[in-house]
């Protein structure tokens, strides 16, 4: 863990303990996650590193409430500490909630995600502005005028020039780097506590990769967001992580 980041128990946002997840397959039960444990603190960056099939994505899908239908949480807990809409401190075990309830209550609002390929993350039939406004209108109960104003501000915050013009454009009219900035803007639309970045630079060229990582770090510092990176790129880890969890065959084998 980076010496620059000091963990404080009162700032713990997420606490995963002894999580075990299996999948029903045609060949029997497959144990995908085997007793993993890690914490995420306010303003911290945790990188989960591992090869394909190590269990990184299954872990994140469980947090987001989007675990595949043949997946089963056998044991363990995922304690999420957050502040509700009335300003009250709350603590909930996501394992005890239905996936539908997690998605409705937290996904896109308190816990947001940046996917690796912006072209598959964005709807080609909707303007950039509408896609950023959508989570605000759904979760924050603001007027369309307020959502539009905040969207234009967000486009500026993520480094997109002439945001009023971009608001009306479609994804195919933007470069790959700009599309990824839009995906980040969508993720930040409702001021989440946790931002999960799933290989956010894989689909981009090297020069754009560095700019996107710098952007996420700047926004994290400005908004005091906790970030989880899912990656196999140790170069990314070296640049951004305060804490690293290495996964292999469903276990965290090194921290």
What are the roles of these predicted feature ranges?
Residues 9-13, 22-35, 66-72, 84-91, ...:
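A short, flexible loop at the N-terminus of ABC-type nucleotide-binding domains that lies
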Residues 146-165:
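Conserved ABC ATPase "signature" region
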Residues 189-193:
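A short, proline-enriched helix->beta-strand linker immediately N-terminal to the Walker B motif
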Residues 77-105, 143, 214:
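ABC ATPase NBD Q-loop/coupling interface
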Residues 49-51:
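The feature captures the beta-strand-to-loop junction immediately N-terminal to the Walker
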Residues 169-174, 178:
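Conserved ABC ATPase signature
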Residues 204, 208-255:
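P-loop NTP-binding/switch modules centered on Walker-like glycine-rich loops
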């Amino acid at each position: 863990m980076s010496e620059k980041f000091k963990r404080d128990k009162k700032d713990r946002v997420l606490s995963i303990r002894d999580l075990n997840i299996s999948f029903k397959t045609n060949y029997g039960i497959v144990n995908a996650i085997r007793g993993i444990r890690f914490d995420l603190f306010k303003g911290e960056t945790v990188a989960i590193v591992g090869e394909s099939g190590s269990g990184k994505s299954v872990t994140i899908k469980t947090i987001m409430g989007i675990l595949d239908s043949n997946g089963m949480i056998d044991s363990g807990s995922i304690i999420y500490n957050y502040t509700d809409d009335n300003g009250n401190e709350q603590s909930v075990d996501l394992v005890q909630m239905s996936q539908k309830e997690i998605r409705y209550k937290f996904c896109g609002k308190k816990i947001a995600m940046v996917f690796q390929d912006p072209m598959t993350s964005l709807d080609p039939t909707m303007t950039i502005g509408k896609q950023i406004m959508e989570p605000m209108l759904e979760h924050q109960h603001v007027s369309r005028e307020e959502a539009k104003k905040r969207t234009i501000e967000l486009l500026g915050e993520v480094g997109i020039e002439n945001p009023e013009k971009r608001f009306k454009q479609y994804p195919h009219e933007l470069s790959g780097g700009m599309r990824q900035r839009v995906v980040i803007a969508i993720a930040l639309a409702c001021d989440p506590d946790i931002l999960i970045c799933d290989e956010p630079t894989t689909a981009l060229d090297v020069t754009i990769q560095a700019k996107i990582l710098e952007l996420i770090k700047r926004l994290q510092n400005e908004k005091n967001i906790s970030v989880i990176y899912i990656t196999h790129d140790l170069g990314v880890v070296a640049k951004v992580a305060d804490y690293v969890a290495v996964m292999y065959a469903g276990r965290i084998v090194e921290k």
